[in-house]
């Protein structure tokens, strides 16, 4: 990979990293790799790895590193990612971060950057508990928007099984425990950029663009 562009978008559940990752991918003309979407696709296809991952995701727990890396690496090795990509939802543990760093360095993509979306726990709980998704296109809607079906796909919106209050708290606890070492790792490497993310999605995106274009 020559002159490839890789951005890793990190943040707690409900921080908007999926939305911002897709917007950045569209802006830069790069693929958007969402580990969550990869897992859900594997689960829907009932692959052996997908079935194992489902047991963890539905309980709000982190998927073991060996399952995560095998799924993500397979996608990163595809021709479409040769010029770079936007990675969302990975890595979530220090071991995953080291594996990804080694992979990117060997792929001549050592000049990657990590964007951390900072959001308070109170805001996260409010966001997640009021969100619904389209099962066809995975677009996320807020309850305050008043939609009962996706305006694009005309499919009824649903709440993900891992968006219940109990599971939200479990996910936040799991995220905090596993991800702090990842943040410290990227800070030590000089890769980390903090973006305050409790403003509007448009304002957050402008802050991200300012960092990527600096």
From Swiss-Prot:
It is found in: Cytoplasm. ATP binds at residues 14-19, 131, 140-141, 199. Pathway: Purine metabolism; AMP biosynthesis via salvage pathway; AMP from ADP: step 1/1. It catalyses: AMP + ATP = 2 ADP. InterPro entries: Adenyl_kin_sub, Adenylat/UMP-CMP_kin, Adenylat_kinase_CS, P-loop_NTPase. The keyword Ubl conjugation does not apply. Zn(2+) binds at residues 134, 137, 150, 153. GO terms for molecular function: adenylate kinase activity; ATP binding; zinc ion binding. Its main location: cytoplasm. Gene3D superfamilies: P-loop containing nucleotide triphosphate hydrolases. It is an enzyme of class 2 (transferase). It comes from the Bacteria. GO terms for cellular component: cytoplasm. Residues 34-63 are annotated as: NMP. Its EC number is 2.7.4.3. The keyword Endoplasmic reticulum does not apply. AMP binds at residues 35, 40, 61-63, 89-92, 96, 160, 171. Keywords: ATP-binding, Cytoplasm, Kinase, Metal-binding, Nucleotide biosynthesis, Nucleotide-binding, Transferase, Zinc. One of its GO terms (biological process) is AMP salvage. Signal peptide: none annotated. Residues 130-163 are annotated as: LID. Consists of three domains, a large central CORE domain and two small peripheral domains, NMPbind and LID, which undergo movements during catalysis. The LID domain closes over the site of phosphoryl transfer upon ATP binding. Assembling and dissambling the active center during each catalytic cycle provides an effective means to prevent ATP hydrolysis. Some bacteria have evolved a zinc-coordinating structure that stabilizes the LID domain. Monomer. Belongs to the adenylate kinase family. Catalyzes the reversible transfer of the terminal phosphate group between ATP and AMP. Plays an important role in cellular energy homeostasis and in adenine nucleotide metabolism. This is Adenylate kinase. The lineage of its organism: Bacteria, Pseudomonadati, Chlamydiota, Chlamydiia, Chlamydiales.
């Amino acid at each position: 990979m020559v002159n490839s562009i890789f951005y890793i978008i990190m943040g707690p559940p409900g921080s908007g990293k999926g939305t911002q990752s897709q917007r950045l991918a569209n802006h830069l003309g790069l693929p958007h790799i969402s580990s969550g979407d990869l897992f859900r696709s594997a689960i829907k296809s009932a692959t052996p790895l997908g079935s194992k991952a489902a047991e963890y995701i539905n309980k709000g727990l982190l998927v073991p590193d060996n399952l995560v890396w095998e799924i993500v690496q397979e996608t990163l090795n595809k021709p479409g990612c040769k010029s770079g990509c936007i990675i969302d939802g990975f890595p979530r543990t220090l071991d995953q971060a080291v594996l990804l760093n080694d992979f990117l360095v060997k792929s001549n993509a050592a000049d990657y950057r990590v964007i951390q979306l900072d959001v308070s726990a109170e805001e996260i709980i409010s966001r997640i508990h009021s969100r619904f998704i389209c099962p066809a296109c995975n677009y996320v809607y807020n309850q305050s928007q008043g939609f009962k079906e996706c305006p694009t796909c005309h499919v009824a919106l649903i709440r993900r099984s891992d968006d219940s209050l109990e599971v939200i708290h479990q996910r936040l606890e799991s995220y905090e425990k596993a991800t702090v070492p990842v943040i410290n790792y990227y800070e030590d490497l000089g890769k980390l950029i903090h973006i305050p993310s409790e403003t509007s999605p448009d304002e957050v995106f402008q802050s991200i663009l300012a960092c990527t274009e600096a």
